[in-house]
Regions:
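Charged, flexible cofactor/metal-binding loops and thiol motifs
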Residues: 93-94, 259-360
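Short coil-to-helix "N-cap" segments within the ABC nucleotide-binding domain's helical subdomain
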Residues: 33, 79-86, 101-107, 129-158, ...
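ABC-family P-loop ATPase nucleotide-binding domain
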Residues: 1-28, 334-360
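P-loop NTP-binding/switch modules centered on Walker-like glycine-rich loops
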Residues: 198-202, 206-288
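Conserved ABC ATPase signature
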Residues: 171-176, 180
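A short, flexible loop at the N-terminus of ABC-type nucleotide-binding domains that lies
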Residues: 15-19, 28-41, 72-78, 89-94, ...
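A short, proline-enriched helix->beta-strand linker immediately N-terminal to the Walker B motif
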Residues: 191-195
Length: 360
């Protein structure tokens, strides 16, 4: 634990080593066709004031991981969750989110831990005004009266730089543009000053200009508040500029985890190497000739069906470096001396052997 002292005498604020520590998280669903293992033995940490990015293609288990952590999955016999999600709150108390009684989890969800969902149009209530939706959270968690809550909702809309906020606070979601709705989602998430923000593809449906504005807004809010962020995305270009740590997921498992700069400079897992090679800035190096014409590089094949996973490494059917042993065993996530980890039986790239610059 690290301790930092404030400007006030005799006041010491203890900063936890980890804001969230996820250990061996697994989530599966029983269906008529069989058991779907959406998340398998996932572990990662999020430090206070830092951003951890969870990266992977669609279907890799990123969103299910976030919904599991927030306890938003359907509570039925068909859903099975194991592992730990150890959250350290502002008082220094460490809580396993997966084991808390539901009333206690409700007091944390939307308060100490908030979430921005992928599609704001389906996440916002169409029959309530923007102001009413933000005020509801403030009344519930901060026990404000209606007048104070609405006044604070207006200040939050101004904080996320929504123009004419006094007018927008009285409007409904369908009256706002996609970029404005996403700013509303950020205001809603920030309403109760969360210590941890989970952002699930927060810029997917936005154009490049609005995307950059939203990401810059989130960065400034993080600097101002000191919150931690779990950033879920498939966009490695965004990750390169906005994350501190990266965990790469494939078929429900983390296949590589490292600080952002070493991961981009020396990707260890073939899947990570393939994702980086697909970036526009890398295409000139990896373009392939087909019938005399250059084609953009792409990882061949597609993710295997979760109902029929390969017997060994899940990435083996698509891997250009696979050997016979890859079809026989699921590799462990092995940790290097430098704190990096990768789930691959192939030899690691020596430190310093490869250096490449990655741009968005």
């Amino acid at each position: 634990m690290n301790a930092s002292t404030s400007n006030y005498p005799h006041s010491v604020v203890t900063v936890p080593a980890q804001r969230l520590e996820v250990r061996n998280l697994s989530t599966s669903f029983s269906t008529d066709e069989g058991v779907i293992q959406s998340v398998a033995d996932v572990s990662f940490n999020i430090r206070p004031g830092k951003t951890t990015a969870l990266v992977g293609e669609s279907g890799s288990g990123k969103s299910v991981t976030s919904l599991t952590l927030m306890r938003l999955l359907p509570r039925t016999a068909a859903t099975r969750v194991t592992g730990q999600a150890l959250y350290t709150n502002a008082s220094g108390e460490t809580l396993d989110l997966l084991q808390l009684p539901e009333p206690r989890m409700q007091s944390i969800r939307g308060n100490e831990i908030a979430m921005i969902f992928q599609e704001p149009m389906t996440s916002l209530n169409p029959v309530l005004t923007i102001g009413e939706q933000i005020a509801e959270s403030l009344r519930l968690h901060k026990h404000m009266d209606s007048a104070r809550a609405l006044a604070q909702a207006l200040r939050l809309l101004e904080m996320v730089e929504i123009p004419a906020a006094a007018q927008r606070v009285k409007e409904y979601p369908h009256q706002l543009s996609g970029g404005m709705r996403q700013r509303v989602m950020i205001a809603l998430a920030m309403a109760c000053d969360p210590k941890l923000l989970i952002a699930d593809e927060p810029t997917t449906a936005l154009d490049v200009t609005i995307q950059a504005q939203i990401l810059e807004l989130m960065r400034r809010l993080q600097i101002d508040t000191g919150m931690s962020i779990l950033f879920i995305t498939h966009n490695l270009g965004v990750v390169a500029h906005h994350a501190d740590e990266v965990a790469v997921m494939y078929a429900g498992r983390i296949v590589e985890a490292a600080p952002v700069h070493p991961l981009f400079a020396q990707p260890q897992h073939p899947y990570t190497q393939g994702l980086i090679a697909c970036l526009p800035s890398q295409q000139r190096k990896r373009a392939v000739l087909v019938d005399g014409k250059k084609r953009l590089y792409a990882i061949r094949g597609q993710v295997s069906s979760p109902l029929e996973p390969p017997p060994g490494c899940a990435f083996e059917p698509r891997c250009d470096q696979a050997i016979a042993a890859c079809r026989e065993v699921i590799p462990e996530l092995s940790l290097d001396d430098d704190g990096r980890s990768a789930r691959c039986i192939l030899p690691r790239i020596p430190s310093g052997a490869v250096t490449q610059e990655v741009k968005a």
